[in-house]
């Protein structure tokens, strides 16, 4: 199984590293082209394009400027340890063993606006470039046109290398839109997480994001290799609801804490 997750806006380059092993991103030639485009933007343009504050725009203009084609542990850190959003709160990669990192390196991929596809141990320099941003480039009007089939092809390589044709889609819609399902040599399974609120079950963004991380961790810790094993997921009160599920969608629910 190949797990797909989204990146995070919040980054951590300060915490102690729990592994010294690293690999290099495989699509850096493409990343360099995007950096070339991003460096043309002024901080006010970045603020408008990304809908962020002037302060954040200044930080990200500096990140684009400081980005270097040579990645080392001095200027970058492993992607799975650098991202720190809700998904990664659930994933808790900082507590992984070396064997966990090994399994994740083969079975987990992070989709990225700048790097395309990241393996957990791929070094990553800090950036902010969400997949949905309309950054004009030599290949089109946005990042979806820029990446084209590249992300899908890279995922097909990963699928072939890890031995089956199942993708567990735990990425957001914004990021999974960069994948072309018809060209992906895989059966796609999407876990959905519903939380009870006032007697009704619905997707609550914060909880759903964290649950995607919890599910990723569940697969990695237990070395799961078959989709039917996912139904045993019960972290933090979630349970599988077979009646609400379909072939391509596994529904997990959690009752409101009273």
UniProtKB/Swiss-Prot annotation:
Cystine pairings recorded for this chain: none
GO CC aspect terms: cytosol
Pfam families named in the record: H2O2_YaaD
GO aspect biological process, one term: response to hydroperoxide
InterPro entries: YaaA (IPR005583)
The organism's place on the tree of life at top rank: Bacteria
Family: Belongs to the UPF0246 family.
Name by which UniProt lists this protein: UPF0246 protein YaaA
Organism: Shigella boydii serotype 18 (strain CDC 3083-94 / BS512)
Gene field: yaaA
